[in-house]
Amino acid sequence: MIRLHRPQRPPLRAPLRATPSLSLRWRVMLLAMSMVAMVVVLMAFAVYAVISAALYSDIDNQLQSRAQLLIASGSLAADPGKAIEGTAYSDVNAMLVNPGHAIYTAQQPGQTLPVGSPEKAVIHGELFMSRRTAGDQRILAVHLQNGTSLLISKSLKPTEAVMNKLRWVLLIVGGVGVAVAAVAGGMVTRAGLRPVARLTEAAERVARTDDLRPIPVFGSDELARLTESFNLMLRALAESRERQARLVTDAGHELRTPLTSLRTNVELLMASMEPGAPRLPEQEMVELRADVLAQIEELSTLVGDLVDLTRDDAGQVVHEPVDMSDVIDRSLERVRRRRNDIHFDVDVTPWQMYGDAAGLSRAVLNLLDNAAKWSPPGGHVGVTMRQLDPSHAELVVSDHGPGIPPQERRLVFERFYRSTSARAMPGSGLGLAIVKKVVLNHGGMLRVEDTVPGGQPPGTSFYVLLPGRPLPPAGHSTPAGESETDKAEAATDPAVPVAGDTANSRESANVISVDSQSARAR
């Protein structure tokens, strides 16, 4: 017995919980508070260091001045004891050391002038002068020329009291500064983020009520530009919904007419087959069946056109090398079966594209059907493809039909648009829209002109610019009547711009020449 061991799938990881986060207003306010607190702390340290250095420097200057005054007066040599006693007062202590003879001291009650290693080095003559802080006293020791040493100290308690008060003042002022910065930051943040709040409310309103009204724009700063971008998005969404609603409405209208006619014919057929019902003449039965089949075919074509036009299957379409000569030949075979009274003048240069073969075939077939439908019986339809440059060729499909009025040229590629003269002709108004979509998806361009400008009738010519590369001739002849002048004019024609990539061409609205845009709705 064979057992199949299926690999165990790792357990699914539980979704991460949404962690609470501070609002943008609080984050901006905390950032402002942090910056102010940092500046306050740095300034407090700087002020404290400067004032502390100034106070200690002042004490050193006082001790230095008193020592110089005693030395310059000569009282230390005349009466050292009295001079030392006169020097010591308040918070100052003094000492005169004469090695081998005597030591004179004058100290305040409760204070003792400390003698450490620096002072001993001065007394022994190893150092000329020393200054240091010992405990709560600042000590100055000076070695005199006669071998004696003068030591003077001053209490630092008054200075420490001042520094303590300074620390409290800096702490209070810094705290008040941070608090003021927090309040001011909150007010500024609230005022600065008011447009963001309006934008947020508008987005929530759209999500809640589907209200696509634009948001008022104030100023010209970054938030104003953000609001304008949001308004553009709202307008695009409104236009998309409008197009969607119009598509549904138009599709329903276009489907209603053949469905109504089909239903009427089917009901008539069913009624004629009821027992006891009068039989329809055979000729009428044949015509009725033909009408039903024609209406079913019309419905199938309309539904297929709608599916091709509305679906976005860019990720499912297989792109492959496509020989446009074969595409044109197959399309011509299908059109000739429907309109065998039309003469097609074909002059095609072998050309290869990389794209969707089915989509390109549908676009070419729609162009040929369009030209054949509007050509009079026995008329001629021209189908030419010529190379413009190493990477672009131009397909031209021309007829000698009635043409299109200039005021309708901007509308012929819209879905379901049909001109007044086209309403009496069969069709759904989707053929040219499909052509436009396919051409743009393949990085091509469209332009439409009169076949015979000023003629009666003027006819219509569709010019399709297609990217690709030439193929060596294989059973197809190159255009014989094309001169070098024609090639130069085609290469420099300003109405034939070179298409960019597919994405850019798909989004461009100006791919159809405005001045020369003419076609008829099918």
Curated annotation (Swiss-Prot):
Histidine kinase domain residues: 250-470
Compositional bias annotation for Polar residues: 502-522
Cytoplasmic side: 1-30, 189-522
Residue numbers spanned by region Disordered: 468-522
Modified residues (Phosphohistidine): H253
InterPro entries reported for this sequence: 2C_sensor_his_kinase, HAMP_dom, HATPase_C_sf, His_kinase_dom, HisK_dim/P_dom, HisK_dim/P_sf, Sig_transdc_His_kin-like_C
Post-translational modification: Autophosphorylated.
GO cellular component terms, semicolon-separated: plasma membrane
GO molecular function: ATP binding; phosphoprotein phosphatase activity; phosphorelay sensor kinase activity
Role summary: Member of the two-component regulatory system MprB/MprA which contributes to maintaining a balance among several systems involved in stress resistance and is required for establishment and maintenance of persistent infection in the host. In response to environmental signals MprB acts both as a membrane-associated protein kinase that undergoes autophosphorylation and subsequently transfers the phosphate to MprA, and a protein phosphatase that dephosphorylates phospho-MprA.
Name of the protein in question: Signal transduction histidine-protein kinase/phosphatase MprB
